[in-house]
UniProtKB/Swiss-Prot annotation:
UniProt lineage: Bacteria, Pseudomonadati, Pseudomonadota, Gammaproteobacteria, Alteromonadales
Compartments, record wording: Cytoplasm
Pathway field: Cofactor biosynthesis; thiamine diphosphate biosynthesis
Disulfide bonds: 346-458
Descriptive protein name: tRNA sulfurtransferase
Gene name of this polypeptide: thiI
Classification via Pfam families: Rhodanese, ThiI, ThiI_fer, THUMP
Binding site for ATP: 185-186, 267, 289, 298
């Protein structure tokens, strides 16, 4: 069994040297991701495709490989195929017939062939021959070239016949690390998650800068979003997560800055700080989730004033998107449930925000800040490899707080998102299971019976550890992590 990875069309249009570089990078990225699934994964680059071989003794890996390939930037689509050899067109038909005989009963069908290499036949001739044979020697209703019930997809490469069993749509975009790095300002809401994803998809290693305005719970939530985006779409490369304690800035804004200018000043301080951090990391651009007119600080006038605080390029991929489109995209990429539970702090600090800030007035207000304020918060910022988010949780959740077996008096809480829980329901005989999504756990845990011990469960164990850590920090001692 193999997967044939088709390159995104924009890659195919590049010059030969660029196309070669992009294809090599995509091959490396695929190998880096799939090696984490299975060390025996084999990836082979060709001029216009990449072949991924599933180990013959591990056919069960096909689903995991397919799921990972669907989330790697630079891929148009992936076809899962079974491989055969052939000597003639009739030989092709004879191998297709037993595979599709039962499937075609009572169905309309057509045959589609893609061919590369030198042969004494063309693709249309194969389609006609195989289609005619299937129509005659199966119980199919007949051939229908438009909107058939079943399409028999075949790919012929020299002496190899690939029978397509499944097609998986890819992300598109460019392979990771074919573009320069960016630093994304992430708050955990709908916008910043989607804007970060857009640049991952575009092939830029996306590092994360978080301005902490809401304490430990806010940071834990944002780390969950960043880790999800990296683990799902950018796992082939290392990135950094920078947490900046921004409460001192907010405190000075509330004490010293004119009420109408607060929102714009806060954003300018964030951009200044992020630009300093980006410069230290050798990064040339910032990414934000701002969308034109969505809030008062995002008018054209205010965005122009915000941009004047730094010479660094500020990229806004969502600038013309409607809010509902952003929410729909967050649902598609898996960040919607995180965003629903994330508090919004930036919009509440100004009661009458200006929509037409004047640069001179804003700069005059900013002179009221302490001289070394940005230096102080940068010095207190914490930079970690994003992989350490999971590792830190492993270290801070002790062995006594992680269990693999369950006592009858313990209760398991499935904290997965509703869609994930429905697709793979957790069932443990004789054990009570409560279903509380992670984004509701912080508010609902206090209502549970304090005499019982609760074991948090999620698929990968990262989110359950983050949530357990937060609850423990809040003083709860009756919570552990369940890792079967």
């Amino acid at each position: 069994m193999k997967f044939i990875v088709k390159l995104y069309p924009e890659i195919m249009m590049k010059s030969k040297p660029v196309r070669m570089r992009f294809t090599k990078m995509l091959e490396t990225n695929i190998r880096n991701v799939l090696k984490k699934v299975d060390e025996d994964a084999k990836v082979q680059r060709q001029w216009d495709r990449i072949m991924v071989m599933v180990p013959k003794d591990k056919p069960e890996l096909a689903q995991a490989f397919g799921e990972r390939l669907a989330c790697i930037p630079g891929i148009a689509h992936v076809v899962q195929v079974d491989e055969y050899s052939f000597e003639s067109v009739d030989d092709i038909y004879q191998q297709v017939l037993p595979v599709y005989r039962d499937q075609l009963a009572g169905k309309t069908f057509c045959v589609r062939v893609k061919r590369t290499g030198d042969h004494d036949f063309n693709s249309i001739e194969v389609e006609r021959y195989v289609g005619g044979g299937l129509n005659q020697f199966t119980d199919a209703l007949g051939v229908r070239l438009k909107n058939p019930d079943i399409t028999v997809n075949l790919e012929i490469e020299r002496d190899n016949l690939y029978m397509v069993t499944k097609r998986i749509e890819g992300l598109g975009g460019f392979p990771m690390a074919t573009q320069e790095d960016v630093l994304s300002l992430i708050s955990g809401g709908f916008d910043s998650g989607v804007s970060s994803y857009q640049f991952i998809k575009k092939g830029a290693r996306t590092h994360y800068c978080f301005f902490n305005l809401g304490g430990a719970q806010h940071e834990i939530g944002v780390k969950q979003v960043a880790y999800h985006l990296w683990k799902t779409y950018g796992e082939s490369h290392k990135v950094k997560f920078i947490s900046v304690p921004f409460e001192p800035v907010v405190a000075e804004i509330l004490e010293r800055i004119d009420n109408g200018q607060m929102g714009v000043v806060l954003k300018r301080m964030m951009m200044r700080t992020a630009a300093r951090i980006a410069d230290r990391m050798g990064i040339q651009a910032l990414v934000t989730g701002e969308s034109l007119g969505q809030v008062s600080s995002q008018t054209l006038t205010n965005l122009n004033v915000i941009d004047r605080c730094t010479e660094l390029l500020i990229l806004r991929p969502l600038i013309a998107m409607d809010k509902q489109d952003i929410i729909n995209e967050s649902r598609k990429i898996g960040t919607e449930d995180f965003a629903k539970s994330m508090p919004e702090y930036c919009g509440v600090i100004s009661q009458k925000p200006t929509v037409k800030a004047v640069l001179a007035k804003v700069e005059a207000e900013e002179k009221k800040f302490s001289e070394d304020l940005i230096d102080q918060i940068i010095a207190q910022s914490v930079t970690i490899d994003i992989r350490e988010i999971a590792e830190q949780m492993d270290t801070r959740i002790t062995e006594t707080e992680t269990v693999a077996s369950i006592d009858t008096n313990q209760v398991v809480i499935d904290i997965r998102a509703p869609e994930e829980e429905e697709s793979k329901p957790l069932q443990i005989e004789g054990i009570e299971i409560k279903r509380i999504p992670f984004f509701k756990l912080a508010t609902q845990f206090a209502d549970l019976d304090k005499q019982k011990t609760y074991l948090l469960y999620c698929e990968r164990g990262v989110m359950s550890k983050l949530q357990a850590l937060y609850l423990i920090e809040q003083g709860y001692t009756n919570v552990k992590v369940y890792r079967p």
